[in-house]
């Protein structure tokens, strides 16, 4: 007869022809009824609540510990299964669990006696590993393997753990206050450093902005200089172009006038020819002399008109070129003239003063004699002595002009006669 079992139990067949007994974990086996016997053993995992009440630790402090262990009979290992069958075959799971629990509780008490409360409380992992190691080596001889062991609870009736927690709490609170103070200190340092870096960055930014503004002003000034130069060149070119355009317009106008006058001359010639024919028809011989005269007059007038038109055209052209050239050269000429005058005045001090005075004397004389040129009539009254008539007027004018150097000396403090007779002195 065949018997089967699940993976959570094992079968042991003994009797006729079964020496040693046959152990089958999770499978089937053939059994001869009446002459062979079959027994079953559970391979289920057993959960054990391992309690150790008031166990004295290494320093003599009694504490209670509760651990949770998972154990089972190992069915895959034949030797362990054989050992388990020898010890637990025919026993229930509760009986097997009680035996394993007593063994674990004894090892747990032994480990507690070799450790302090602080070690058990603070390093539960170490305690669990030691219990697991010691209990496993003992239970394996029974065919039981410890799947896991975990420390569940630690307590005492003397408030030792509570006092230990208070001390630890006080230490933690102290460390927390110290940490908070250090954190505030570090935060203040970091904040001050951040403010310093912010101010430094702000100053650096302002410096960069100032540099950028300076570069902008320099570039703008250079650009303005270039723009003004180009604008001045453009204005000068525009003025030159305007002058050339005016010149061209004037030349065209003169050409038109020349053409018109040529047409007028042609009309006059036609009129002369008509009159000649008319005179010839009336009185040819008596009018030949007059005709000859008219022809000569007409030719003279024609030549005069042509020459006048050409002269006007040339004058307009030259005037336009002179204006165009003057626009471009006036500034340079004035600047060179002023520079040369300044150099001359620096080089020839008194001679330069004399040159200036002599240059202005004709203008002064012109202004003095100006009223005489505008007079329509001069009436002379004399007592009979001295010169009379135009000679008298001339003498008066010459007398005024001879006193002119004295007037200049009184006004400017410079004597023309002294400067003229001195040798030239240079600076």
UniProtKB/Swiss-Prot annotation:
The modification Phosphoserine is found at residues 19, 163, 385. SMART domains: PHB. The lineage of its organism: Eukaryota, Metazoa, Chordata, Craniata, Vertebrata. GO terms for cellular component: adherens junction; basolateral plasma membrane; cell-cell contact zone; centriolar satellite; COP9 signalosome; cortical actin cytoskeleton; cytoplasmic vesicle; dopaminergic synapse. It is a peripheral membrane protein. CDD domains: SPFH_flotillin (cd03399). One of its GO terms (biological process) is regulation of receptor internalization. Keywords: Cell membrane, Endosome, Membrane, Phosphoprotein. Pfam families: Band_7, Flot. Heterooligomeric complex of flotillin-1 and flotillin-2 and caveolin-1 and caveolin-2. Interacts with ECPAS. Belongs to the band 7/mec-2 family. Flotillin subfamily. It comes from Pan troglodytes. This is Flotillin-1. Disulfide bonds: none annotated. It is found in: Cell membrane; Endosome; Membrane, Caveola; Melanosome. May act as a scaffolding protein within caveolar membranes, functionally participating in formation of caveolae or caveolae-like vesicles. The modification Phosphothreonine is found at residue 387. One of its GO terms (molecular function) is protease binding. It comes from the Eukaryota.
């Amino acid at each position: 007869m065949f018997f089967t079992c699940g993976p959570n139990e094992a079968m042991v067949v003994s009797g006729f022809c079964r020496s040693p007994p046959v152990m089958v974990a999770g499978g089937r086996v053939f059994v001869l009824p009446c002459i062979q016997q079959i027994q079953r053993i559970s391979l289920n995992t057993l959960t054990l609540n391992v309690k150790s009440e008031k166990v004295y630790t290494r320093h003599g402090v009694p504490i209670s510990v509760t651990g949770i262990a998972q154990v089972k009979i190992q069915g895959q290992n034949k030797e362990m299964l054989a050992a388990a069958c020898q010890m637990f075959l025919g026993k229930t799971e509760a009986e097997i669990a009680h035996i394993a629990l007593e063994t674990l509780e004894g090892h747990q008490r032994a480990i507690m006696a070799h450790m302090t409360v602080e070690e058990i409380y603070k390093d539960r992992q170490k305690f669990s590993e030691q219990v697991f190691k010691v209990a496993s080596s003992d239970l394996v001889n029974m065919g039981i393997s410890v799947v896991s062991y975990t420390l569940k609870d630690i307590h005492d009736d003397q408030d030792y753990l509570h006092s230990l927690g208070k001390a630890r709490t006080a230490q933690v609170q102290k460390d927390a206050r110290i940490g908070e103070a250090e954190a505030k200190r570090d935060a203040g340092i970091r904040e001050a450093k951040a403010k310093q870096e912010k101010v430094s960055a702000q100053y650096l930014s302002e410096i960069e902005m100032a540099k950028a503004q300076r570069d902008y002003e320099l570039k703008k000034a250079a650009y303005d200089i270039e723009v003004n130069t180009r604008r001045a060149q453009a204005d000068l070119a525009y003025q030159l172009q305007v002058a050339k355009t005016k010149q061209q317009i004037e030349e065209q106008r003169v050409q038109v006038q020349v053409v018109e006058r040529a047409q007028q001359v042609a009309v006059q010639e036609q009129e002369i020819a008509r009159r000649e024919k008319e005179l010839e028809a009336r009185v040819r011989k008596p009018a030949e002399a007059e005709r000859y005269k008219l022809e000569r007059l007409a030719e003279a007038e024609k030549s005069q008109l042509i020459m006048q038109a050409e002269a006007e055209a040339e004058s307009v052209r030259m005037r336009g070129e002179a204006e165009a050239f003057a626009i471009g050269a006036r500034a340079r000429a004035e600047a060179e003239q002023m520079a040369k005058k300044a150099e001359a005045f620096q080089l020839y001090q008194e001679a330069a003063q004399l040159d200036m005075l002599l240059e202005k004397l004709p203008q002064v004389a012109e202004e003095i004699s100006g009223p005489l040129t505008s007079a329509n009539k001069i009436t002379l009254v004399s007592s009979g002595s001295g010169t009379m008539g135009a000679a008298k007027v001339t003498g008066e004018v010459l007398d005024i002009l001879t006193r002119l150097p004295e007037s200049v000396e009184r006004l400017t403090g410079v004597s023309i006669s002294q400067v003229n007779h001195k040798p030239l002195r240079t600076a």
